[in-house]
Regions:
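Positively charged, low-complexity terminal tracts
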Residues: 1-76
Length: 76
């Protein structure tokens, strides 16, 4: 298991029936530069699923794209 430090828990995106939550955190993996991170975690943050890391510059671009996007609807 990789070493990690969660510097800031930004928020939960969803919660599964098994108690795991999909979260957005600001985290450092293996003592590297902290990144934004979206992945599932157990309640104790001792286990995690696959996720995606986003650098600060990528987060700025993502935020701009989301701000410019109209609300999307499912069932298209």
């Amino acid at each position: 298991m990789k070493k990690y430090t969660i510097y800031k828990h930004i928020g939960n995106l969803s919660k599964r029936n098994n108690g795991w939550t999909k979260e957005l955190n600001f985290i450092s993996w293996d003592n590297r530069e902290p990144v934004y991170d979206i992945r599932t975690w157990n309640a104790e943050h001792t286990e995690y699923g696959e996720g995606a890391t986003i650098t600060a510059s990528q987060m700025e671009v993502l935020k701009k794209l989301l701000d410019e996007a109209s609300p999307l609807k499912t069932g298209l």
